Amino acid sequence: MSQCFAVKGIGGADQATLGSAEILVKYAQLADKRARVYVLVSTWLVVWGIWHVYFVEAVFPNAILWLHYYAASYEFGFVRRGLGGELIRMLTGDHFFAGAYTVLWTSITVWLIALAVVVWLILSTGNRSERRIMLALLVPVLPFAFSYAIYNPHPELFGMTALVAFSIFLTRAHTSRTRVILSTLYGLTMAVLALIHEAIPLEFALGAVLAIIVLSKNATGATRRICTALAIGPGTVSVLLLAVVGRRDIADQLCAHIPHGMVENPWAVATTPQRVLDYIFGRVESHADYHDWVCEHVTPWFNLDWITSAKLVAVVGFRALFGAFLLGLLFFVATTSMIRYVSAVPVRTFFAELRGNLALPVLASALLVPLFITAVDWTRWWVMITLDVAIVYILYAIDRPEIEQPPSRRNVQVFVCVVLVLAVIPTGSANNIGR
């Protein structure tokens, strides 16, 4: 059988590689050659991470897609997605672009910090083992991780960070009072983030419920129900408030408020593979006035209510969206399968923790349905579902005895193949491929 990486027989390492390998040898009592494999994989991740950042910033910049999330404000009334723009307007005045880019990169930074904390917890929890190294190296290449932050920096990165923080703190909470306080803080955070993007509380309700059930060890059923209500209730109320009293007749006023400024817009010329290459290699240029682009492509949507949005999704139809749905489902299955393969903790063991508490996850899952009904970003919703399950699965797995088991040579080979490939392919860029 072909092998992506020869685990045995790696030689010629330089001094830096040897030094890093020695650290891994001491960490998990690895053989020198096996340790060098992980050092080389780590180096591969760093190199490709730098390339992805360079590609997004210098080769194919698409910030115009993400700045528009902060275009609306409360200057003309209470409107959905208005909080981000309102904060920028209050803090930066006429310097919209400086403020918007700051918020954009803040969302990316806090999410990458959250991922770094998860990696650190994987390596520092329990006894040192080789599988911990493998799991720590797997995390950055998952669909919701590094490439998602770089290629798809939606405002939900703030919600993703909040979910990770909430899940981690729950693993440290040992009393009902602490869990109730954490759930209250998380719920209030979701209520605020709903004012930046109305999907955020719905996207992460499932993750919060799974964390409460699985990671709150020895919690009573009553405590879990109270924590669930506190964690998902405030955000849900915010979403309903936006649906009921948020202004819908505001597109023209918002358009008049949007600042002018030229921004790179590669999508205007990226109509064929050849045109994409022409843009990448600098043979053609493409800029758009931010004001004109937002007024044409974004502000008209602020006049739509939820029913009209659902009708538009119905017009697109399930057949057209099936590819996006299938790709997202593939991400979910592949992610959970790789976590199981690397950690050696069976998926059934993880889901067995839900036995007797299925009503709460089902309720949280029901909150995801409006997302699929009112928006066509079906791959994106599946990536968020993947995060909901994966982050709790990972934090659960690192406390299990199975992760201390030494991997077989084949385990390492498969792991290396997968990570090397996923480092190159930015799965997080698949916002809605397949539609």
UniProtKB/Swiss-Prot annotation:
Q: Where in the cell is it found?
A: Cell membrane
- Protein name, per record: Uncharacterized protein Mb1527
Taxonomy of origin reads:
Bacteria, Bacillati, Actinomycetota, Actinomycetes, Mycobacteriales
GO CC field: plasma membrane
Predominant location category: membrane
Species this chain originates from: Mycobacterium bovis (strain ATCC BAA-935 / AF2122/97)
Membrane topology according to the record: Multi-pass membrane protein
| Segments passing through the bilayer | 40-60, 103-123, 133-153, 195-215, 226-246, 313-333, 358-378, 381-401, 414-434
Question: Keywords assigned by UniProt?
Answer: Cell membrane, Membrane, Transmembrane, Transmembrane helix
The organism's superkingdom is given as Bacteria
Q: Does the UniProt entry include the keyword Signal? A: no
Which Cys-Cys disulfides exist here?
A: none
